[in-house]
Amino acid sequence: MAAVVALSLRRRLPATTLGGACLQASRGAQTAAATAPRIKKFAIYRWDPDKAGDKPHMQTYEVDLNKCGPMVLDALIKIKNEVDSTLTFRRSCREGICGSCAMNINGGNTLACTRRIDTNLNKVSKIYPLPHMYVIKDLVPDLSNFYAQYKSIEPYLKKKDESQEGKQQYLQSIEEREKLDGLYECILCACCSTSCPSYWWNGDKYLGPAVLMQAYRWMIDSRDDFTEERLAKLQDPFSLYRCHTIMNCTRTCPKGLNPGKAIAEIKKMMATYKEKKASV
């Protein structure tokens, strides 16, 4: 009996050894595959106004995706830290909250911190600053006009009787507060405004979707007393009425908001306001 057991063990040993060798080879192949470089190319808009004779051009960088985070901003930071420290762009929160890293990625305006890298290694990812804006350097647009327009709508609570300011709360019902959902979440990244053809051609007069959505946010706030005055400021032919419902703004918003709908609501409010004004 002992001889039979010994024979059985001897017969199994080669199979066991062979299985172990196969498993080890398989693990080795997986490790090799995991460590194989995954080189992704990024073509990035470059322009330095402080460099004499420099003209806007595209510069291509290569990044190993195995050594990079999943978002486009991760790749930009890696390029700046490890390849080219002169590359300039804005960024802050890295969580889709501040709006700093807004740029045009593969043809669409979005946030670099929330846009995942296209892992197709055969395609070059193209990155530009927000379109139709003056460029300060590389991927940094000049947002001075955008912020000035935002300031012009007085984006804060206004009361006609200020005697109670700081002495009591301005209460809202749940229903009144819910009217602000889909409006207050705007982070002023300018993705929507810079995707709007009407804003491209009339940016000096047309306020654009981002600013108009914020104007609407304060018009319908139950605590605000200046709705009619806010409407009166938009009566000219350009501030509001250059919107032609192209809806690029809604399609591109990285927060999933609907500026086009807000503008349509302002137009309806404006019609009622004008009727009321004419009847006086």
UniProtKB/Swiss-Prot annotation:
Membrane topology classification: Peripheral membrane protein
Residue span(s) of domain 2Fe-2S ferredoxin-type: 40-133
Activity regulation info: Enol-oxaloacetate inhibits the succinate dehydrogenase activity.
Transit peptide, start-end: 1-28
Pfam families noted in UniProt: Fer2_3, Fer4_17
Domain 4Fe-4S ferredoxin-type as annotated: residue spans: 176-206
Entry keyword set: 2Fe-2S, 3Fe-4S, 4Fe-4S, Acetylation, Disease variant, Electron transport, Host-virus interaction, Iron, Iron-sulfur, Membrane, Metal-binding, Mitochondrion, Mitochondrion inner membrane, Oxidoreductase, Primary mitochondrial disease, Transit peptide, Transport, Tricarboxylic acid cycle
Subunit composition and interactions: Component of complex II composed of four subunits: the flavoprotein (FP) SDHA, iron-sulfur protein (IP) SDHB, and a cytochrome b560 composed of SDHC and SDHD. Interacts with SDHAF1; the interaction is required for iron-sulfur cluster incorporation into SDHB.
PANTHER family on file: SUCCINATE DEHYDROGENASE [UBIQUINONE] IRON-SULFUR SUBUNIT, MITOCHONDRIAL (PTHR11921:SF29), SUCCINATE DEHYDROGENASE IRON-SULFUR PROTEIN (PTHR11921)
Record's protein name: Succinate dehydrogenase [ubiquinone] iron-sulfur subunit, mitochondrial
